[in-house]
Each structure stands twice: as C-alpha cells, then as structure tokens.
Design a protein with these regions (language model features):
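Single-stranded nucleic acid-binding surfaces, predominantly the OB-fold ssDNA-binding core
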Residues: 1-109
Length: 109
C-alpha cells in the first residue's frame, strides 16, 4: 500500500509567480484559517505562508501569466522535502508544495 501524499490549500498570492530553470515557476501564497482559542474563548486567526513550486511547464506558464499579488487560488498537489546545508555542519529540512493542479479564483472588480 502506498502512503498518501496529497494537499489541498486555498489562499491568496503574496508574491507573484516567477519563472525558474527548466520551464518551472515558484510563487508564495498565504492561507488563513480560524481556530478556537481555548485560553481567551472565541477564535484566533492563524496565517500560514507557503512556497509553491509548479513543475509542469504548461501549468507554470499559466501561473506566470495569471497570478498577480492578491489573487485567490486553490492548489492541489503534494509535499516535497529538501535538506539544506546551513553551515557549521547543520542541516535544515524544508517542505514545499509541488502543485499538480491550480484553480484561479475570479478577480473581484
């Protein structure tokens, strides 16, 4: 049996899509959710900034053309990890979302 590696995230673009090597693109988005605050009662706002990579060249081109800052989107994809050397013999592990499907929400006038 294979492990499930799938994510669905909705949010707002905070850094416009930019081209990278090999006809790919990267963009940053912010997903906001509200959760109950057991200490103070009520709810609190939780913001989650994410870095999203698009590896499919045709989807990457569409993202570069259609993702200005402030646009709402829905991303379906998978998590991918990478180990980064920080210095002093330490490594830092980062996760990014690799988009397989991007839905552009309508721009409100």
């Amino acid at each position: 049996m294979n492990d499930l590696n799938s994510v669905l995230i909705e949010g707002t673009i905070i850094e416009a899509a930019r081209a990278t090597a090999d006809n790919r693109c990267m963009f940053s988005m912010l997903s906001v959710r509200y959760e109950s605050d057991s200490v103070n009662g009520g709810t609190k706002k939780v913001e989650l900034p994410l870095e999203v990579e698009v590896k499919l060249w045709r989807l990457a081109k569409a993202c570069i053309e259609n993702l200005p800052v402030g646009r709402r989107i829905r991303v379906v994809g998978r998590l991918e990890g990478e180990a980064l050397a920080v210095g002093g013999g330490f490594e830092r592990y980062c996760l990014r979302v690799v988009a397989e499907h991007v839905e552009f929400k309508p721009i409100k006038a």
